[in-house]
Amino acid sequence: MSDLQKGMALLISTFHKYSGKEGDKCTLTKGELKDLLTKELGGAFGNCSDQATLDKIFKDLDTNADGVVDFQEYATMVACTTMLCNKSLSKK
């Protein structure tokens, strides 16, 4: 398996590690998203213990406004975060 394939598999397995604990196994609830952001991305999303911050992040990610974050919305978040990290690291 190539490095890129391993990265894709990790992206998928990380999503499913947190999804389905509170509801549908193919989506993330707000609580599941909070756990994922806190445990997997640390400070990259600021203070996720602040409810207003979490609500804003969730609203921005839930682009179809169905009350959950699906895999496509999650993958978009990871891709955008990766682009921001790349941009920051490229400046150094």
Swiss-Prot record:
Domain EF-hand: 12-47, 49-84
Molecular-function GO terms, alphabetical: calcium ion binding; calcium-dependent protein binding; transition metal ion binding
Organs and tissues of expression: Abundant in epithelial cells of olfactory rosette, barbel, skin and gill but not brain or muscle.
GO cellular component: cytoplasm
Keyword Metal-binding: yes
UniProt keyword Calcium, yes or no: yes
Chain residues that bind Ca(2+) 2: 62, 64, 66, 73
Record-linked Gene3D superfamilies: EF-hand
Residues annotated to bind Ca(2+) 1: 27, 32
CDD domains noted in UniProt: S-100 (cd00213)
Keyword tags: Calcium, Metal-binding, Repeat
Physiological role: Plays an important role in catfish calcium homeostasis.
Record's protein name: Ictacalcin
Species this chain originates from: Ictalurus punctatus
UniProt lineage: Eukaryota, Metazoa, Chordata, Craniata, Vertebrata
